Structure formats: structure tokens, C-alpha cells
From Swiss-Prot:
UniProt name for this protein: Zinc import ATP-binding protein ZnuC
GO terms for MF: ABC-type zinc transporter activity; ATP binding; ATP hydrolysis activity
Biased amino acid composition, Basic and acidic residues: 234-245
Top EC category: translocase
Disulphide connectivity of cysteines: none
Function recorded in the entry: Part of the ABC transporter complex ZnuABC involved in zinc import. Responsible for energy coupling to the transport system.
EC number: 7.2.2.20
Annotated keywords: ATP-binding, Cell inner membrane, Cell membrane, Ion transport, Membrane, Nucleotide-binding, Translocase, Transport, Zinc, Zinc transport
Length: 254
């Protein structure tokens, strides 16, 4: 199956400093949920921006299928509190959508009827669902979520990831997530990539939870994911390898 995005030997440096990312190989296939985890400063958000073409590469390349439709929920969205903006108007940025389409997107993400509310009056959970609704308006083949549950409480986090799984089942879109919510994310993912400037290990959540590199990075929190993980997906990526790489040809036989 042709990957939606494939990166080979990807490295990124900022201003001539030490590389933020070093020789990273990465791919995501249609319909799979892939989560990138790692400590603060490990390059997770930089990897997402590189895959989307938003930052320059020091080396390597990124290939995307032609015409790939991407829905993006960024890590931070700054809304000027002094500038009134309704949910309806927000959904039409950057491109205009009809009333019926906007209403359907809000319904799909569990926040129907919010069109007239001010963005600044929304709760954290409502705002994340509105962001997701906007990302879904373009009927994406790939949904990219960069730390989508920041500021949510634990029930809100669980509910949001349940919604993501429902959206994936309904739309068949692939999902690429960056997250620190290890306990929840592990159970919501088909494949996990553990990043710390380079790929430390990757594979199914169960395998990554037990990997020495993962446990070295996350310590007792890693033990918790291993203990609580209950995942029954039958998926091709059941391997874990230290420094596992997909190779420069963006081909990965299974």
C-alpha cells in the first residue's frame, strides 16, 4: 500500500545549531493511526512541520502522494480576545464553507449548535472539537493532530481520543498524532513512534511499551502504559527495533 507521506533520512537544524531531528525515516499509510511520543524538546512538533512542508530540511526528503488532502489541528491557536469571532466565522477560515457543511462538521465532532458562540467563550474541550471540525471540512485523507488535548482534564482527554477513533472509523482517514498522553494514546494507536531527536523505537503500542528505549525515556510512566495497555488491533507493524529505519527509497516491505 502506497504511503500517504514518506520521509527518508530527514534532518532539521535551527540556525546552524545541533540538529533537532537527525536521520529520521518515517511513513504513514492510508487508514492507520500513528502516534509520535517523546519528551519535551524531542522534535515531535518539528517532525510534523517537516512532514507537512512547513520547515526547511537540512538533509533528506519528504514525499507526499499527489493532491494529498490534510486536515491539521495545530498545537497552539492564538485568538485575539479583543476581536469578536463566532464559531461559524472561524470555520470559514481560511476558506469559506456553507452553513450546512459547517453544521454537519460540528455535529460530527459532538458540538452541534455552536455556530453563534464566540470562540473565546468556549471551554477547552469545545474549542478542541471546533478545531477538529474545521480540520474535517476538507474531507482529509490524513488528519494531523499536534498535542490536541493540551489543557483538557483526564475525562476530556479520554473523550477526545474516543472521538478521534470514531472519526477515523467513519472517514477512513489516516491519523498522525503528537502527544504526551501516554496512557490514553497507547490504546488509541495502531503504531507508535518514540522520538528523541531520532527514532528510538517504533511498532505496536504493546511492543513499544516494553521496549528498553521507551522505558528509559519515560520511566515509571512507561511501566504504567505497559500495565494498562489492552489493544487488540491486528496490524502489520508488530516490530520494534532500536533506531529502526525505513530506508532512503521510502519502501518498507512487509
Amino acid at each position: 500500500m502506497t504511503p500517504l507521506i514518506c520521509a527518508a533520512d530527514l534532518s532539521v537544524s535551527h540556525g546552524g545549531d545541533l540538529p533537532v531531528l537527525s536521520h529520521v525515516d518515517f511513513l504513514i499509510r492510508p487508514g492507520e493511526i500513528v502516534t509520535v511520543v517523546g519528551p519535551n524538546g524531542s522534535g515531535k512538533s518539528t517532525l510534523v512541520r517537516a512532514l507537512l512542508g512547513h520547515v526547511s530540511l537540512s538533509s533528506g526528503r519528504v514525499e507526499r502522494v499527489p493532491g494529498l488532502r490534510i486536515g491539521y489541528v495545530p498545537q497552539r491557536v492564538h485568538i485575539e480576545r479583543a476581536m469578536p469571532m463566532t464559531v461559524r466565522r472561524f470555520l470559514s477560515l481560511p476558506r469559506r464553507v456553507g452553513d450546512a457543511q459547517a453544521a454537519a462538521a460540528l455535529e460530527r465532532t459532538g458540538v452541534p449548535g455552536l455556530e453563534g458562540r464566540q470562540i473565546t467563550a468556549l471551554s477547552g474541550g469545545q474549542f478542541q472539537r471546533v478545531l477538529l471540525a474545521r480540520a474535517l471540512l476538507g474531507d482529509p485523507q490524513l488528519l494531523v493532530l499536534d498535542e490536541p488535548t493540551q489543557g483538557l482534564d483526564q475525562p476530556g482527554i479520554v473523550a477526545f481520543y474516543k472521538l478521534i477513533e470514531e472519526v477515523r472509523a467513519e472517514t477512513r482517514a489516516a491519523v498522525l498524532m503528537v502527544s504526551h498522553d501516554l496512557l490514553v494514546v497507547m490504546r488509541a494507536s495502531d503504531r507508535v513512534v518514540c522520538l528523541n531527536g531520532h527514532i528510538c523505537c517504533e511498532g505496536t503500542p504493546q511492543a513499544v511499551s516494553a521496549a528498553p528505549a521507551y522505558r528509559a525515556l519515560f520511566g515509571s510512566e512507561a511501566q504504567g502504559t505497559l500495565a494498562l495497555y489492552q489493544h487488540h488491533h491486528d496490524h502489520d507493524h508488530d516490530h520494534v527495533a532500536e533506531g529502526h529505519r525505513h530506508g532512503p527509497a521510502c519502501a518498507h516491505p512487509h
